[in-house]
Amino acid sequence: MKIFQRKMRYWLLPPFLAIVYFCTIVQGQVAPPTRLRYNVISHDSIQISWKAPRGKFGGYKLLVTPTSGGKTNQLNLQNTATKAIIQGLMPDQNYTVQIIAYNKDKESKPAQGQFRIKDLEKRKDPKPRVKVVDRGNGSRPSSPEEVKFVCQTPAIADIVILVDGSWSIGRFNFRLVRHFLENLVTAFDVGSEKTRIGLAQYSGDPRIEWHLNAFSTKDEVIEAVRNLPYKGGNTLTGLALNYIFENSFKPEAGSRTGVSKIGILITDGKSQDDIIPPSRNLRESGVELFAIGVKNADVNELQEIASEPDSTHVYNVAEFDLMHTVVESLTRTLCSRVEEQDREIKASAHAITGPPTELITSEVTARSFMVNWTHAPGNVEKYRVVYYPTRGGKPDEVVVDGTVSSTVLKNLMSLTEYQIAVFAIYAHTASEGLRGTETTLALPMASDLLLYDVTENSMRVKWDAVPGASGYLILYAPLTEGLAGDEKEMKIGETHTDIELSGLLPNTEYTVTVYAMFGEEASDPVTGQETTLALSPPRNLRISNVGSNSARLTWDPTSRQINGYRIVYNNADGTEINEVEVDPITTFPLKGLTPLTEYTIAIFSIYDEGQSEPLTGVFTTEEVPAQQYLEIDEVTTDSFRVTWHPLSADEGLHKLMWIPVYGGKTEEVVLKEEQDSHVIEGLEPGTEYEVSLLAVLDDGSESEVVTAVGTTLDSFWTEPATTIVPTTSVTSVFQTGIRNLVVGDETTSSLRVKWDISDSDVQQFRVTYMTAQGDPEEEVIGTVMVPGSQNNLLLKPLLPDTEYKVTVTPIYTDGEGVSVSAPGKTLPSSGPQNLRVSEEWYNRLRITWDPPSSPVKGYRIVYKPVSVPGPTLETFVGADINTILITNLLSGMDYNVKIFASQASGFSDALTGMVKTLFLGVTNLQAKHVEMTSLCAHWQVHRHATAYRVVIESLQDRQKQESTVGGGTTRHCFYGLQPDSEYKISVYTKLQEIEGPSVSIMEKTQSLPTRPPTFPPTIPPAKEVCKAAKADLVFMVDGSWSIGDENFNKIISFLYSTVGALNKIGTDGTQVAMVQFTDDPRTEFKLNAYKTKETLLDAIKHISYKGGNTKTGKAIKYVRDTLFTAESGTRRGIPKVIVVITDGRSQDDVNKISREMQLDGYSIFAIGVADADYSELVSIGSKPSARHVFFVDDFDAFKKIEDELITFVCETASATCPVVHKDGIDLAGFKMMEMFGLVEKDFSSVEGVSMEPGTFNVFPCYQLHKDALVSQPTRYLHPEGLPSDYTISFLFRILPDTPQEPFALWEILNKNSDPLVGVILDNGGKTLTYFNYDQSGDFQTVTFEGPEIRKIFYGSFHKLHIVVSETLVKVVIDCKQVGEKAMNASANITSDGVEVLGKMVRSRGPGGNSAPFQLQMFDIVCSTSWANTDKCCELPGLRDDESCPDLPHSCSCSETNEVALGPAGPPGGPGLRGPKGQQGEPGPKGPDGPRGEIGLPGPQGPPGPQGPSGLSIQGMPGMPGEKGEKGDTGLPGPQGIPGGVGSPGRDGSPGQRGLPGKDGSSGPPGPPGPIGIPGTPGVPGITGSMGPQGALGPPGVPGAKGERGERGDLQSQAMVRSVARQVCEQLIQSHMARYTAILNQIPSHSSSIRTVQGPPGEPGRPGSPGAPGEQGPPGTPGFPGNAGVPGTPGERGLTGIKGEKGNPGVGTQGPRGPPGPAGPSGESRPGSPGPPGSPGPRGPPGHLGVPGPQGPSGQPGYCDPSSCSAYGVRAPHPDQPEFTPVQDELEAMELWGPGV
C-alpha cells in the first residue's frame, strides 16, 4: 500500500491522504514510542495513538503496510504528534503499523502492531455506557462507538436537522459533518414510534434528504447519514429555515401532534439572506431551535436563530474537527428539553387548540385595511398577525390580545397586494396560520386641475385638495423641442392648492403635473398643458400726417414694461429699407420719404426675453401737391404780378412760365424757394396770357402745374384785373369773394366743399353740384345756399363712385360775383384689400386681407380649384376677423379665392387672387430597364414623403398593379407585364394620412422579337419530393469577378431549374429570396416579393451580374439580419434554409457566423465550384456534410448535383419538425424558448418576465412572474401541428410563491380558448398530468404521482421529459424514468389558437391568471428516444464532467500536486487565420494595359444635395392685377420686412415624466460568496443602499503583459473569471509551499491560509425593481482589482463573510428617490500568503519580485473555485487508506482547498 510517492524533488501527499495534526511535545533521548493503541472511528477509519518516548528526538516515521502484501506507505511526523487517524481502510484487511522515533540520522526501535477493523469492532461494547469520560483537552473526535451518553428518556421527539452544504465547507470537512451527525443520531432511541429524525441540506436551494417518516430504525438513519451527498452552493440560511418550516414539520412529512419538535441548524458562515422572520416563524410554531456554528459562523446570527437561552441553544466551534467536542453537551441538552417539552405537552393535552377562522378584510384604503377573524378555540393568549407584500418585502407583524378579533394594518404601500396570516398563540404552542390576501387602493390623486391667469412668463395652477395628503409635488417643463430637459419641480405643503408658476418662457407650451404626496409616497399624477402668451406687440397702429415726404406713426403701448421698439419700414421695390430703435414712446415721425411711394411698416416691442411679433401697416406718400393759390394782380399794360403760397419747406425752386393764349413764345424763369411772388414784365398791352407755376423739389421731382390766365390792360384801362384759378383756368374777373375752393373728405355717399372767403362783403354763397358726365347743359342735381360767413358744406347723399362738379358763387347785395368750380368724386363701395397667403402646406393654407375703410358686417370667402372640376366652396367669418386657415385642399393645386365684404348696401366688389398649396409629389419620374414583361419606375425622393403608392395601369385592358413602398425608396419594378403594351405609371406621394396627386408617365414595354418566333418558357413542373415543401429559402449567389458573365448565367440557369422543382410559392408554400454577394451583398428580391412560381422564375432570369470580391461571411450575416426578418416575410415555425453557391475561398471569416446560424436552427447547404475551398464549405454547411455540402468541378456540372440538392432541400422543407441544434447535434424539433421570446436578446420585450441565474450560475433562466401569461399564436409555433411521437422537455423549478392550485406548465388552446394538449402541475396535490385529444375526438388525461413526482415541487431545478407515443406516455425526471401509462394515439392540433405558459387551470378565456415559476429550458423533440440519450448535464447533482460538454466559461482544476514543468508537447497544428494586416505601401506602377472596350452606360447618379437657401426676404404680397401679356423677365422682387424670430415648433407631446420617487429603504444585501447553484428564491430582497468605497488593499506585483485575449464577456463575468483565477493560483502556490515545508521538516509557525471568498454569481438582467423597503444593514465590500503574481507574505486579514448577489426583485419600477445615506466603510480583502519562511521574528517585506516571463495566451475560461476542492485530495482507492489529521491545542496547520 502506497501512502507517499516521490515526484521530482518534492514530497507530495497522494490524493487519498489527509494531513496529520500534531498534539504533544516530548523531549528526551531517542527511544521507541510505547503504548500503541487503536480506536475505531468508523467502518473504514481508525485512530492510532501512542506515548511519546523519553529524551530528545526530532520526529516520527509512521509506516502502514497491508499484511497480505503491498507497498508500505510512510509519513514523517513532527515530534509533537501522539495520535493520527487513518482513513480509507478495508474492514476485512489486516494491517501492520509501525511508529519510529528518530533524531537526525538515528532511529529508535519501532513500536508496532497489527489490526483489522472488524476484529476491533467485535471487541467493542455493543451498548455504550451513558457515562461520559472526560478526555482532558477534549480534542479527540468521538465516534459512534465512543459516545458515552445515550438519551434514555421515554419521551419522544421529531428532530429535523438542517445542514449547510455550501461550497465553503468543502468535501473534506463535510466528512467530519457526517461523523458529527452519526454521533448525534447514535445518542437517541430512533424509530417510527420513537424519536424521528429528518434531515435537509441547503445551499442556494434547500432540499429534503429524508423526511421524519422516511426510516423506521436507527441503523437506517445512520446509513443515510454516512451516504449523505455533498451538495455545494451558496449560503441562504433564511430560505432553508423557511423551507423546513413549510415542508418538514407537516403531518405528511411525518411530524406528529403532541410530540416535541426540535430543529438543529449546522452552518459554517453568515447567511446571505434574512434569517429573522423564518426563525421567528419556526419558534412561534412550537419548534425549539438549536444552532451550531463552525469556523466563520456569525455568533450574533446564531443567537437570532436559536431559541432562548443562548447558553444552551447556541454552540460555536473554531474548526470542523472540533465538532465532536459539543456532541455530549448538545445531546444532553436535547434529551432534557425533550423531557421538559413532553411534560408541558401532556399537561396541556386537555387544552383545545386550533387556528382562527373566517378571515375577512374591510375598510380598505391606500395605506391601511382592517383584518377580522373568528376566535380560535381554547384559551388563546394572543393573536399574531403577519403581513407582507406579495411581490416581496420584509414581513411585519401585529400582536394583539387573545380577546381581540380584529386589527387595522397601517402604514401600508398603496396599490399593493399583501399576504396575511393570523396565528393563535397558546401557552405552549401556536396554531397554524389563517391566511388570506388583500390589495390596498391607489393613493387618491389631485383632481380638477386648472391652468389659468396665463401671461407671457407665468401661469397659475389650481386643483382640488386631496384628503390626507402631506403635501404636493408640482413638475413643469416646456414641451418645445430642445427645451424638454428644462424640467423644474416645486414642493408645497398640504394647505396650498393654488400656486403661481413664474419665470416661464413666452409663447411656449408647458406640461404641468401635480402629485399628491403621502409622506414619501406619491399618488398617480394629474397633468395639464397650457401655452404661455406670446410677447405682446404694440397695438392699434395709426398712420397720420402723410405727406409727400413724411408721415407720423402712432400706436398704443403694450400692457407690460418693455425696453423699447424697433421700427422697420421699406418701399415696395425693396430699394429702401430703414430701421430704427426707439425708447418706449408711442409716436414717431418718418421723414425723408419718397413722394407717391408705398411703404410697409413693422413695429416690434423689445423685451428682455426678445422681441414680439410685428405690428404692421401700409401707407402711400402723397404726390407733391400743386400750388393751391395762384393770384395775378398789379396788372398794367405791359406787366402784372404773380403771387402764390409755398406749400412746404422742401420745395427747392419754383419754375414760372407764361405764354400768350393765342400763340407766341413760352418764357420761363426759375425762382428761389423763399420767393412767393414775381412781376412779369415786357408784356404786350391788352393780351391774354396763360401763366403756369410748378415746384421743383430737392430730389428732382416736380409738383403738378398750376395755371392762371391774366390779361394786360389796354392802353386806355387803369383798374387792375385779378384771376384766381385753383387747378383749372378761370376767366379773369375783377370782383370775387372766393379763393382756394377744395372738394374733399370723400366717402361713398358724401363730399365736403371748403373755400376761403376773400371778400367780407359777400352776403351768401350758392353751392350747386351736378354729375360731371354728360351734356354741359345737364340739369343741376342740387343747390344749397349758405350764409356769407360760412366757408364749408357737406354734400349728401351722393352716389358712390361718381364724379361731381361743384360750383360756389358769391352773392353780393348788388348781384353775383365770380363763380368758382372744382371737381370731386365719391368713393366706390369699399371692399377688402391686400390679399396675402401664408402657412402653405400640402393640404392647407392661410389667407389674410386688410379690412376696407368702410364699415362691414362680415366677409364671404369663396374658393374653387382651377384645373380640376369641383364644387365652389365658401365660408363666412365675422367683421373682426381678417384671416382664415383653409383646410382639406388638394396638394399642388391652384385655387381662385374671392373675398367679399358684407355691407349695409350689399356685398362689395370681390378681392380676388390665386393661391396654391405645396406640391406633394415626386420629381424626375422615369421608366428604366424596360423589358418585354417588366419595367422599373425611378424617381427623385420627396423630402417629406413617408411612403409612395406606385400604380401601373395597362391602357389596353385597364389591369392594374399597385404597391406601397417606403419614403426613402427611389425605384420600384413591375413584372408580369404584357409585351408591346402601353402602360401608365403613376406615383402618389404620401405624408402620413395625406396623399398627393399622382405624377404619371407613359411607357411601352418592348415588343416580342420578330426574328425566329420564340415561345414563353415552359414552367418546370414540381417534383414529387417537393409537393409538401414549406420553408423560407434564401439563395446566396457569389457574384465575384472570378465567375464572369457567362458562368453567372449558368448559375442563374441552375437556380431556375432548382426553384422550378418547387410546388407552391408564397405564404402557403415556400418563399424564396435571392442575394448576390461580393464586397457588399445585394438583395435581388425578398422572401415576400413573389406569390407565384411564374413571377419568381421571371425575376430570377433578370438578375444581373454584379462583380467584386468574395466576402461570404459578411453575406451570411447580411442574410440573417436583413432577410430573415418579419419585414422581409420570414414566418415563425417554418424551416429556414440557405443555399450558398461560391467558386472561391472567402476573404473574411465564415466559421463563426455559420456556426451561430446552425445553432439557431438554420439549415445551410453549401455548393462549391472549381476553386472553392472544401474545408470552408464544410464549415458553412450544416451537419451531416454528406447531405449539406456539394462540390462540382466547373459551372457546367451543376446537373450532376441538381436532383440530389432538390431532394435534400425539399425534405428539409417538408418536415413537420424543423431541424434544431441541441447539445452538439442536429435534431428535428422546436426550440420553444426561442419561439416564446425567452432568450437573452428578446426576453426584455416579453412582459412579466425577468432573467435570473440558472443552474451552475452560468446558464440563464427566465422567471415568469405572476399573471405574466406568456403566449404565442399556434400558427407561429406549430403551423403544421405536432407529430404523432414526440418528447416534451422542461428544465424548471417551482418557486415559494407558486400557487397551490393547478396550472399548465404549457398548453395549446384553440380559438375558443379550449385546451387541446398540455402539461398540468398541481402544486397542492403534488401531481403531474398530461392531456390531449385522441384520434376519435375524445379528451384523455394521464396523471402521475408519488415520491419521485413530488420532488419537482420542492424548489430545486428539475429536468422533466414527457415522452408521448401512439400507445403510451412516459415521465422521466432528472434522467430517471418514474412512470408510464397507456394512452391512445393523439389527434393533431388546430393552429388557430394560442400556446401559453403558466396558465392557471381555473382561469378561462384568452386572458386570465398565470402562475409564477422559473424556466431554464423548454424543447419539443420529434422523437421518443431523446429522453434516453439526455445526460442531464445542466443539473449539478447529475452532471458527469467526462461525458458532458464544458460549462460556459469553465475551467478545470488540476488533480495533481506536481509543480515541475512536464516535457515539451508535440508541435501544434496550424494556427487560426490571423487578423487582417495593415495596408501595404503602394507598389510600382505596372505597364499600361490594352484599351478596354466601351462599356455600357452607367446608371443615373443620385440627385445632388439641395443648394443653400437664398438670402432674400419675402416681401408683403401685392394686390393681384389683371392678367396681362407675357412680359420680359423682370428684376428680382422686393425684399420684405424681416420678421421676428419665431419660436421653434414641436413634435408630438412627449409622455409625462414619472414622479421622482422616494428613497427606497434597503433590504439586507448578501455578502459576496462563491458561485453556486441558485436556490429557490424566497421573498425577493430589497436593494440595499450603497456604502462608501472601501479602502484599497495593497497592490500585488504586476505580471508580465500577456498576449491579446479573445473578446471578453460582460464585465461581471470578466470580473468573476479574474477573481476566480487569482483564487486558484494563490491557493495552489500556498498549498505547494506548505507541503514543501512539512515534508522537509522545516519548523513553521502557524500560518493559516484562510478562505478566499468566491466571486459573486453573474448578475442577471435587471428585473423590474421591487417596492421600496426599509434601510438594510451595510453592504459588504466589493472585489478588488486583478492581482499580479503573489507578493511577499502579508498580515493575516480579517475573515470575510461569504455570500452572493441576490436575485433581482420583482415588481414595477418604483419612482426615483433622493440618494440614500452613506454606508459604513468597507474592508479590504486579505492578501495572498507567500511561502513560509524559517522560524524567527517577522522581517520587513521583501522587494517586489522580477515579473515572470510572458505566458502563452489561453482561451477565456471560467474557474469555479468550488470545483477545485482540496487540491491533491481524491477519493480513496479501495485498497489504500487516507489520513485525517487530528488537531491538538498546540501547533496547528490549516489547509483548505480552493473555494472552501
Swiss-Prot record:
Short motif (Cell attachment site): ranges: 1607-1609
Cross-referenced Pfam families: Collagen, fn3, VWA
Assembly description: Homotrimer.
Domain Laminin G-like, first and last residues per copy: 1229-1424
Collagen-like domain mapped to chain residues: 1462-1510, 1514-1570, 1571-1609, 1653-1705
Organism: Homo sapiens
Region named Disordered: 124-145, 1462-1613, 1644-1781
Biased segments, Basic and acidic residues type: 124-134
Keyword Electron transport: no
Composition bias, Pro residues: 1728-1740
Function field: Plays an adhesive role by integrating collagen bundles. It is probably associated with the surface of interstitial collagen fibrils via COL1. The COL2 domain may then serve as a rigid arm which sticks out from the fibril and protrudes the large N-terminal globular domain into the extracellular space, where it might interact with other matrix molecules or cell surface receptors.
Main subcellular localisation: secreted
Region called Triple-helical region 2 (COL1), residue ranges: 1654-1779
Protein name: Collagen alpha-1(XIV) chain
GO MF annotation, one: protein-macromolecule adaptor activity
Residue span, Fibronectin type-III domain: 32-122, 355-444, 445-536, 537-626, 627-715, 737-829, 831-921, 922-1010
Composition bias type Low complexity, residue spans: 1473-1482, 1573-1585, 1741-1757
CDD domains listed in its UniProt record: FN3 (cd00063), vWA_collagen_alphaI-XII-like (cd01482)
Keyword annotations from UniProtKB, A to Z: Cell adhesion, Collagen, Disulfide bond, Extracellular matrix, Glycoprotein, Hydroxylation, Repeat, Secreted, Signal
SMART domains (alphabetical): FN3 (SM00060), TSPN (SM00210), VWA (SM00327)
Post-translational modification: Lysines at the third position of the tripeptide repeating unit (G-X-Y) are hydroxylated in all cases and bind carbohydrates. Prolines at the third position of the tripeptide repeating unit (G-X-Y) are hydroxylated in some or all of the chains.
Residue span of region Nonhelical region (NC4): 1217-1458
Sequence segments annotated as region (Triple-helical region 1 (COL2)): 1459-1610
Signal peptide positions on this chain: 1-28
Similarity field: Belongs to the fibril-associated collagens with interrupted helices (FACIT) family.
Protein's GO biological process: cell-cell adhesion; collagen fibril organization; extracellular matrix organization; homeostasis of number of cells within a tissue; regulation of cell growth involved in cardiac muscle cell development; ventricular cardiac muscle tissue development
